[in-house]
């Protein structure tokens, strides 16, 4: 068992990583007998895990209610959020309740935002079931729902009281979802840790093959990096913005194509190549390192090009709604070397468009 602490003073919390955690009620600390829980999951995961987790909690004396939501990025919406609020109010649940987010990034983000809002804030526990949520979205307190005009535009910074990462969940994860999570894994190597990027180059095939020893190390390292960044910059005023590598471009893909058509990690993978291409055109990132990134993404089963049906000009309106835009100026996270990145403003729209165009299936720069 691995345990990592996200250090935020009195709001610090543990990330527990191991196989078989769902079998032990102690995994769901700080829950105690007699406390009330609302377990939030989706229609895909409910048949796999809901009854088991509920039984373990009830055997420990926890009073459990549940709400089962539709599955998919397109349901990370205000309308679906209202279903959670209605379930809480109908029981009813008070300020002493705890929400448990049993699912991937959509369930985690939506449940966390519900916890932040319900009666002005109740406890919640993240129980991520996808690789993407285990290495990224469950840690750090970013909670949100989408709006038709932009991803994660309605949300709050609100930290969980714990994160429970049961490695056994990955055994039921579809291959496409595993690859989507690997995009965020690769991101950490590009922006923060050259040695980890090299480790990924040597071990990506083992990760794709669901080698549990490799996955355990990979998840632990990503959580360590994320915890360090969040402890230093919880509300994304500086360092934490680097975690958005590829997201300004990738969120444009998700919004334009329709949420869920491209998985989040797929869009971020293409976005990271676009960011690297932009950095190269600015003279701060080598062509050799772009090729290393592309090769690793391809081995992970990820795209390195944007959607063919999205013309470069369709990206910019979405990118200008990005949360990093200040005073109308586009600010991009760009790599400067493998293991290093920066937030850079003042990049001309023509250069951004040219970089996107270079990442079309028939237009990749040689």
Swiss-Prot record:
SUPFAM superfamilies: Dehydroquinate synthase-like (SSF56796). The keyword S-adenosyl-L-methionine does not apply. NAD(+) binds at residues 71-76, 105-109, 129-130, 142, 151, 169-172. Binds 1 divalent metal cation per subunit. Can use either Co(2+) or Zn(2+). GO terms for molecular function: 3-dehydroquinate synthase activity; metal ion binding; nucleotide binding. One of its GO terms (biological process) is chorismate biosynthetic process. It is found in: Cytoplasm. Pathway: Metabolic intermediate biosynthesis; chorismate biosynthesis; chorismate from D-erythrose 4-phosphate and phosphoenolpyruvate: step 2/7. Its cofactor is Co(2+); Zn(2+); NAD(+). Its EC number is 4.2.3.4. Catalyzes the conversion of 3-deoxy-D-arabino-heptulosonate 7-phosphate (DAHP) to dehydroquinate (DHQ). Belongs to the sugar phosphate cyclases superfamily. Dehydroquinate synthase family. This is 3-dehydroquinate synthase. The lineage of its organism: Bacteria, Pseudomonadati, Pseudomonadota, Gammaproteobacteria, Enterobacterales. The gene is aroB.
